[in-house]
Amino acid sequence: MDRFYSLSHSSIDFHFKQTPRDFVVEEVPLYEFCGEGEHLILFVRKKGISTLELVSMIAKYLGIKNKEIGYAGLKDKHAMTKQYISLHKKYEEKMDTFEHEDVKILSKTYHNNKIRIGHLNGNKFYIKLKKVNPTSALKIDEALKNIASFGMPNYFGYQRFGTDGNNHIDGELIAKGEKKERNPKVRQLLISAYQSHLFNLWLSRRLEINSLIQNFDVKELEPLLNIPQDELLKMKSQKHPFKLISGDIMEHYPYGRLFEFIGEAHDFDRFNAKDISVTGLLCGKKAKHSTGLSREIEKDFDDEINEDGARRYAWVFPKDIDGRYKDEEAQYELNFYLPKGCYATVLIEEIAKRKIV
């Protein structure tokens, strides 16, 4: 899908390919490991293989089932990644002799529980952009400063939608009972892609509204957006690039309870201070809906499917952003941290202001 971007610069030309040399990910765990307990915790570096391939490889080596190995999240295949896995410590001695050319065990410790999906705070990234000229490097500098100050939209990345980008199409058919999928994991993957697609469409629409708010007068906007003048004036006065609308569902950041935004001044301040953020809908049962004007926009991207829904941060705040231009190599290197569930490729696309695949 074509989408709106949050930054105002023109698109930046550079080369990016997701390879282990140019794309490095390091997992940041949810908690410190205590150093004792029946679970062996391995910090593993891998390149060119997915998390599930790593798990299958180790399970086969140990003669155990894949489900006996714990991990917090799925890491990219086309990258150099460092992540934690857990298994019973009775396998420690055999793992001491485990060898693979694309896998290295960097360290080990112990803990009193198995690592499970979601047991991570986020990920640290190192990324290299190539064929960058000095003018583009300056534009990248400014884009990173803007993201460091205000944050960025939390789109689902292209990886969510499969190699052909069409997983959401099958997901919609399955969710509506028009197509069958016997494998429960594949079924859930495809339906999630459909939910993610609707979320991305909604987020792009909100960014389009932001752009219109910034570039047109209130008198021009009222008939264009069908939003009352007093609400448009409130949106115009907001300093943040993502304009909050009455009825938005907010969430304490980086985690916490949901609550409804009713336009109170201290909530604008908390959003600017990165203490709260706005959420978008992942359609389905049990999901909290926005209200009022916000719901008028959201309902066009909702679908009453018989699956559990949720809210997802629509706007996130990357941390520890650092960029360096290497003139002689025409390369730009950047480091940053993203909370779990966020895509580094989305940040790169925000900088480029275009698709990168």
Curated annotation (Swiss-Prot):
PROSITE patterns with a match to the protein in the record: TRUD
E.C. number: 5.4.99.27
Catalytic activity: uridine(13) in tRNA = pseudouridine(13) in tRNA
Gene Ontology biological process terms from the UniProt entry: tRNA pseudouridine synthesis
Taxonomic superkingdom: Bacteria
GO CC annotations, alphabetized: cytosol
Residue stretches spanning the membrane: none
Function: Responsible for synthesis of pseudouridine from uracil-13 in transfer RNAs.
Enzyme class: isomerase
Name this protein carries in UniProt: tRNA pseudouridine synthase D
